[in-house]
Amino acid sequence: MNGTEGPYFYIPMVNTTGIVRSPYEYPQYYLVNPAAYAALGAYMFLLILIGFPVNFLTLYVTIEHKKLRTPLNYILLNLAVADLFMVFGGFTTTMYTSMHGYFVLGRLGCNLEGFFATLGGEIALWSLVVLAVERWMVVCKPISNFRFGEDHAIMGLAFTWVMAAACAVPPLVGWSRYIPEGMQCSCGIDYYTRAEGFNNESFVIYMFVCHFLIPLVVVFFCYGRLLCAVKEAAAAQQESETTQRAEREVSRMVVIMVVAFLVCWCPYAGVAWYIFTHQGSEFGPLFMTFPAFFAKSSSIYNPMIYICMNKQFRQCMITTLCCGKNPFEEEEGASTTSKTEASSVSSSSVSPA
């Protein structure tokens, strides 16, 4: 084995020189230069500095403006809540431990950080699944006269939390475990060892199949069918131009969210699967650190996409930030009105664009 396994940790360095120490008790500066830990801390501070305001603003603006409180927006707000979980439960912890050079918060802190990071990522993934299914149901109409209502949105929210908990909770109760990874300043699922009594192998397979591959298959199926339906509707001119345009805008926004999720999380998932299938092989601390910390940036892209691609939300956000008056409203009056009308063709089936 090209690493050192201890009680509740695995360090990717053979302890031939005797310098390897527990990541819960000693700085890990023998793994990489101390400056790298400072850089990680600064990176996490940047994510907090951006992630908290944009996600909180998304929640606040939607709650303040009644016209934004549509069923589909409930799911988008769910993404903001998940991101805030990651910011408060994960990022603050990781920034603090990076500043110390080791996981100074001990096993409890590791469990909390790993849990919140996993929970937030899974809520985001399953929210994208619900959005994909909603787009498929509304645009492709496999069920005639289907309207995505408040009851559907609430069921979708409950579904995302149940599925996320089904992935994040088991390591807390003995099916696998959370351990420090990479530079030993953040925690994740134990892909690294076959520690006796934790059944890591079965949990990792369960997680990859049920909480990564199956959701992605559902998403790709829905958007494959969606693409075909949009082309057919455009060719047949079955719906009004404003309705088609509004549905395309919403679908485009959700597709970009899915692509951004894949860009952020696929490197981490790929490296984790490689480590799991090549346990004992040689790899450095940075091998897992880069994809793990890159995945954490997912907390800021969803609200940024939402703000950039949803003109109605942008107008409401500017109004909120400017104390109830939008200084650009007069300049964009006619354009904004036409866009709002297009986005409001059917609040239950076309929101939130």
UniProtKB/Swiss-Prot annotation:
Q: Which residues bear sugar attachments?
A: N2, N15, N200
Q: Does the keyword Secreted apply?
A: no
| GO MF entries | 11-cis retinal binding; G protein-coupled photoreceptor activity
State the post-translational modifications. Answer: Phosphorylated on some or all of the serine and threonine residues present in the C-terminal region. Contains one covalently linked retinal chromophore.
Ranges that cross the membrane: 37-61, 74-96, 111-133, 153-173, 203-224, 253-274, 287-308
Say if the entry is tagged with keyword Cell inner membrane.
no
Question: Which Cys-Cys disulfides exist here?
Answer: C110-C187
- Gene3D superfamilies according to UniProt: Rhodopsin 7-helix transmembrane proteins
Query: SUPFAM superfamilies of this UniProt entry?
Result: Family A G protein-coupled receptor-like
Q: Where is this site: Plays an important role in the conformation switch to the active conformation?
A: E113
Q: Where is this motif: 'Ionic lock' involved in activated form stabilization?
A: 134-136
Keywords per UniProt: Cell projection, Chromophore, Disulfide bond, G-protein coupled receptor, Glycoprotein, Lipoprotein, Membrane, Palmitate, Phosphoprotein, Photoreceptor protein, Receptor, Retinal protein, Sensory transduction, Transducer, Transmembrane, Transmembrane helix, Vision
Give any Gene Ontology cellular component: plasma membrane
Which stretches are tagged as biased composition: Low complexity? 334-353
- Report the sequence similarity comment from the record: Belongs to the G-protein coupled receptor 1 family. Opsin subfamily.
Tell me, in a sentence or two, what this protein's role is: Photoreceptor required for image-forming vision at low light intensity. While most salt water fish species use retinal as chromophore, most freshwater fish use 3-dehydroretinal, or a mixture of retinal and 3-dehydroretinal. Light-induced isomerization of 11-cis to all-trans retinal triggers a conformational change that activates signaling via G-proteins. Subsequent receptor phosphorylation mediates displacement of the bound G-protein alpha subunit by arrestin and terminates signaling.
Q: What is this protein called?
A: Rhodopsin
Give the organism, scientific name: Chelon auratus
